[in-house]
Amino acid sequence: ANQFLGSKNVKDLAFLTELQDFIEKRHAEMPEGSYTTKLFKGGAAKMCKKVGEETIEAIVEAMNGTNDQFIYECSDMIYHLIVLLTSKGIRIEDLARELKARHKG
């Protein structure tokens, strides 16, 4: 495993990759009635707006809500961010590599 994470945490984090794989499949197939399809069809403006809205909701919960509410809103924010990343051909692993490169410890 990783020096920072136990094996359960690594499996939990691996779900972000699985989620992006699913979102990429939605992007390729664009099934009718899918919320993810609706986001892709709305273009960058719609996706960016949703990332912004969900980020604000997460901030509000961080300031005034419970940890469970904060986690819920952060999950929405991450989902919408992954949709936006996918639309730009960027993988969540690209963000992990960037963060790892910045880590000096």
Short names for language-model regions:
Residues A1-C74, I78-G105:
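Flexible "arm" and connector segments at domain edges
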